[in-house]
Amino acid sequence: MKKNFRVKREKDFKAIFKEGTSFANRKFVVYQLENQKNHFRVGLSVSKKLGNAVTRNQIKRRIRHIIQNAKGSLVEDVDFVVIARKGVETLGYAEMEKNLLHVLKLSKIYREGNGSEKETKVD
C-alpha cells in the first residue's frame, strides 16, 4: 500500500480518535473520520501487549494485505484507524480477514461487490 494511503502523523491519529466514530468487534476496533481527499487513508495500531516486534509486524502486514485486497470496495473519502485487540495474534489469515471485514462493514467503510473482486462461477 502506498504511503499516501496511510495515516502517519500523530495529529491525524488524535483527530480521528477525538472527532471520529468507533466501531468494534472482539478482535478489532475501527475509528473513522471523513476526509477531503479523493482516497481513503488507514492507520494501524498494534499494542506491545500482543507480542514481540516480529508478531506485531506480522499482524500489521496481514491487516495491510487485507485492506489492499479490499481496496476497490472501500469508501474513498474517509480516514480510519484499525486497532488490533488481544487475541488477534492467534488468528490465522482467513479468520483475521473475516473479523476485519466484519468490523469494516459495521462502520460502512467496506461495501461488498463494489470493487474489483472477481466472481467465480460454479457450474
UniProtKB/Swiss-Prot annotation:
InterPro entries given in the database record: Ribosomal_Su5_D2-typ_SF, Ribsml_uS5_D2-typ_fold_subgr, RNase_P, RNase_P_CS
Source species, domain of life: Bacteria
Keywords recorded for this protein, A-Z: Endonuclease, Hydrolase, Nuclease, RNA-binding, tRNA processing
EC numbers: 3.1.26.5
Catalytic activity field: Endonucleolytic cleavage of RNA, removing 5'-extranucleotides from tRNA precursor
Gene3D superfamilies per UniProt: 3.30.230.10
Signal peptide location: none
GO biological process: tRNA 3'-end processing; tRNA 5'-leader removal
GO molecular function: 3'-tRNA processing endoribonuclease activity; ribonuclease P activity; tRNA binding
Keyword presence, NAD: no
GO cellular component, one term: ribonuclease P complex
Pfam families linked to this entry: Ribonuclease_P (PF00825)
Described function: RNaseP catalyzes the removal of the 5'-leader sequence from pre-tRNA to produce the mature 5'-terminus. It can also cleave other RNA substrates such as 4.5S RNA. The protein component plays an auxiliary but essential role in vivo by binding to the 5'-leader sequence and broadening the substrate specificity of the ribozyme.
Entry-linked HAMAP family: RNase_P
Family statement: Belongs to the RnpA family.
Binding partners and assembly: Consists of a catalytic RNA component (M1 or rnpB) and a protein subunit.
The protein's name: Ribonuclease P protein component
Phylogenetic lineage: Bacteria, Bacillati, Bacillota, Bacilli, Lactobacillales
